[in-house]
Amino acid sequence: MVNMKASMFLTFAGLVLLFVACYASESEKKEFPKEMLSSIFAVDNDFKQEERDCAGYMRECKEKLCCSGYVCSSRWKWCVLPAPWRR
């Protein structure tokens, strides 16, 4: 009974290590969170209201400056609300 528990534990631990190793090698190739969030917040051209001189909330701020009340996130390059920990 103890041998079966130990072998199941070792098998499970091996599978977890294999998963972590595969994920680490894939994450070097892809920036999954950034791609996923960009696709979630992507705006279709049909839904755009108007072009402005500044970028609003959750808009890309690479070329445009953010509107007043927003700051450009250094990590995601989107206009976000300023927060004490971002200053």
Swiss-Prot record:
Q: In which tissues is it expressed?
A: Expressed by the venom gland.
Which residues are assigned to the propeptide feature?
25-52
Assigned GO CC terms: extracellular region
What InterPro entries does UniProt report for this protein, alphabetically? Huwentoxin-1, Huwentoxin_CS1
Pfam families, A to Z: Toxin_12
Per UniProt, the keywords (alphabetical) are:
Disulfide bond, Ion channel impairing toxin, Knottin, Secreted, Signal, Toxin
| Signal sequence coordinates | 1-24
Entry's family note: Belongs to the neurotoxin 10 (Hwtx-1) family. 51 (Hntx-8) subfamily. Hntx-8 sub-subfamily.
Q: What is known of its domains?
A: The presence of a 'disulfide through disulfide knot' structurally defines this protein as a knottin.
Q: What does this protein do?
A: Ion channel inhibitor.
Listed name of the protein: U3-theraphotoxin-Hhn1a 11
